[in-house]
From Swiss-Prot:
Organism whose genome encodes this protein: Escherichia coli (strain K12)
DHFR domain mapped to chain residues: 1-158
Protein name, per record: Dihydrofolate reductase
Annotated keywords: Antibiotic resistance, Methotrexate resistance, NADP, One-carbon metabolism, Oxidoreductase, Trimethoprim resistance
InterPro entries: DHFR (IPR012259), DHFR-like_dom_sf (IPR024072), DHFR_CS (IPR017925), DHFR_dom (IPR001796)
PROSITE patterns for the chain: DHFR_1, DHFR_2
Effect of residue 42 to V: Increases catalytic rate almost 2-fold
Pathway: Cofactor biosynthesis; tetrahydrofolate biosynthesis; 5,6,7,8-tetrahydrofolate from 7,8-dihydrofolate: step 1/1
């Protein structure tokens, strides 16, 4: 099963200049909980913004210009990325925008964090048809001392 995991502000903004323009430790914990011990696929820009392999996960970098870091697996196509994951129950696609666009048609599940923030962004989550998805989990949280904005975790499964 292919799943996408993303944090989205208003207007589906997911990033600005290779960074997330908010401070939500709870979302980072949600991300870790849902990706640990699963292969993660990301684009080169996302890889560069993280700066290191995510521990406890097979890191697969999709790029037309593969790098030389041998701590991760470099691939040039969506099919190659899927094959590099091996026989696993769930593959997690973690961004960025172009990689989400490439995998959305193949995805069966979306793990979304909806952030109540209007922020400037240069990267967006692809538009998706809500009628194609069923919400199977939703959990709202107010902003607090650690988390700069209110947010809602949601899991959607393709109908």
């Amino acid at each position: 099963m292919i799943s996408l995991i993303a944090a989205l502000a208003v207007d589906r903004v997911i990033g600005m200049e290779n960074a997330m323009p908010w401070n939500l430790p709870a979302d980072l914990a949600w991300f870790k909980r849902n990706t640990l011990n699963k292969p993660v696929i990301m684009g080169r820009h996302t890889w560069e913004s993280i700066g290191r392999p995510l521990p406890g996960r097979k890191n697969i970098i999709l790029s037309s210009q593969p790098g030389t870091d041998d701590r991760v697996t470099w691939v040039k196509s969506v099919d190659e990325a899927i094959a590099a994951c091996g026989d696993v129950p769930e593959i997690m696609v973690i961004g960025g925008g172009r990689v989400y666009e490439q995998f959305l048609p193949k995805a069966q599940k979306l793990y979304l964090t909806h952030i109540d923030a209007e922020v400037e962004g240069d990267t967006h989550f692809p538009d998706y048809e809500p009628d194609d998805w069923e919400s199977v989990f939703s959990e709202f949280h107010d902003a607090d001392a650690q988390n700069s904005h209110s947010y809602c975790f949601e899991i959607l499964e393709r109908r």
